[in-house]
Amino acid sequence: VSRICIIPRADNTGGVSSFQAKMAAGLAVRGIQVCHDLDETPYDAVLLTSTTRQLLGLLRQRRRGLRIVQRLDGINWLHRHLPTGPRHFLRAEYGNRLLALLRSRVVTHIVYQSEFVRGWWGAQFGPERVPSVVIHNGVDLSAYSPDGPHVRSITVSRLLVVEGNLQGGYETGVATAIGLAELLAGQFPLELMIVGRVSSRLQTESQKLSRVPMVWGGLVLPDQIPPLDRSAHVLYSADLNAACPNSAIEAMACGLPVVGFATGALPELVTCDAGRLVPYGGDPWKLEKPDLPALAGATAGILQDNARFRESARHRAEEAFSLDLMVGRYLDVLLG
């Protein structure tokens, strides 16, 4: 029986935790075991999903002939443009440097989450010295499906934002979502629902400034996301320069079309009529003011032809983002 060591174990919310859970489930279906400790030998390969200080342990396993596969996310960057505080700044820079060290000196193979991520790492830290491949994130298409419980209004359109964390510099996504909702509210009966970790101060301030009805969902468990996606009419993908946003993939799997700016990996993911992407209108890396009217126009088009976009979104997910496809491609890298 094959066994994969996935480290470090993620115990938080967000992308890494979601990926590890999906990967473990997909491996279990194939009869492959998982552990989360380098000392729990034997195993057949190591999958590194974020930073770790266990460099000596990884090098020891590499000398034994095991593949050490690094799954690379994007590079921390918002802290360089926003006042997130010295502690956050140092932690973000340390994380970047440690990942770069692992990439250049320790691992035997690299999986980039998107072509965008591959180019980003290459531009900032130079070309990799080991074999690499791009594997987009996947999702369980039976759990994340248009079929299932939902409460989707036929009179009020719901604009949905789903992010694990909308703090630490990511508050800009909330401001943009509110601005988008304000522009749409003149054309459509509309409510804005924001799911993710948001400070109570930001909630209060936003509610005062906006005339659009707002629903704050807070942090939710993964199994609560499909009903939320099914109950909305369009997802605004709020993360600028995102590496491979799970929320967009999960939305499409549930038949929820995606709207956003054409930054990061979104142009690789949201194709055909699975949604609409528009040029940012300024420099997203400098957090310049975005082109909200263009975004509102694209969103209006989705709301006016929602059924067609919903069908196309699901088709795109079935075509490219199945969990089985993702796990199979990772196993090709891990086990050869």
Annotate the PLM regions:
Residues A100-P131, V139-A143:
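A short, active-site helix/loop in glycosyltransferases that binds the activated sugar's phosphate group
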Residues P149, P290, A294, Q304-L334:
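A charged, aromatic-enriched C-terminal amphipathic alpha-helix characteristic of glycosyltransferases
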Residues H150-E182:
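Conserved donor-binding/catalytic core segment of Leloir-type glycosyltransferases
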Residues Q203-P226, S231:
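Nucleotide-activated donor-binding/catalytic signature segment of Leloir-type glycosyltransferases, i.e.
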Residues L240:
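Aromatic "clamp/platform" in nucleotide-sugar-dependent glycosyltransferases that forms part
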